[in-house]
Amino acid sequence: MDSLKNHLLIAMPSLDGSFFERTVIYVCEHDEKGAMGIVINRPIGLSVEALLIQMDLDAEANLSDDAQVLIGGPVLPDRGFVLHSPEKVWTNSEAVSDYCTLTTSRDILNAIGSADAPSQFKVALGYSGWSKDQLEQELADNTWLTIKASSELVFDVDYEQLWTLATKELGFDIWQLSSQTGHC
């Protein structure tokens, strides 16, 4: 299977009632060892500004109330992950695409609270991870649909609308799909 890095995983309706119900996950890494991604449409009810204040970091910049901390996934829920535009690289940054970098070091949080903030960012606690061949099996089991990610879908779409808009990118009504089709 080709790498799904820089793709979105869209939860199938069959995941309703689970942790991943109507989630959209931005895949940051995918290779023969497994995969890692960040849920980009599940706010936890805490603004980024409030998080910075809790961490005793300056919040000089006027952060939008729309800048919410996300549940990135069930793995390491106390660890922060920041998806951001690549204007600058911080201590622990890795490019995911030409429009998105993943940073896990605290220095980016200092920048987010200042005039040095990246133009686009999402802050998440935790990540979603898959061991070797686990994601491939979940795809074969019709747990996820995939589309190529875009800057607009990753950064610009409202959290509540992202799952619906991402499913529309597929070109069909996701509610008409059966989880039992496509495999012999």
From Swiss-Prot:
InterPro entries: AlgH-like. One of its GO terms (cellular component) is cytosol. It holds the Pfam family DUF179. Transmembrane segments: none annotated. Gene3D superfamilies: VC0467-like. PANTHER family: UNCHARACTERIZED PROTEIN YQGE, UPF0301 PROTEIN YQGE. Belongs to the UPF0301 (AlgH) family. This is UPF0301 protein Sden_2674. It comes from Shewanella denitrificans (strain OS217 / ATCC BAA-1090 / DSM 15013).
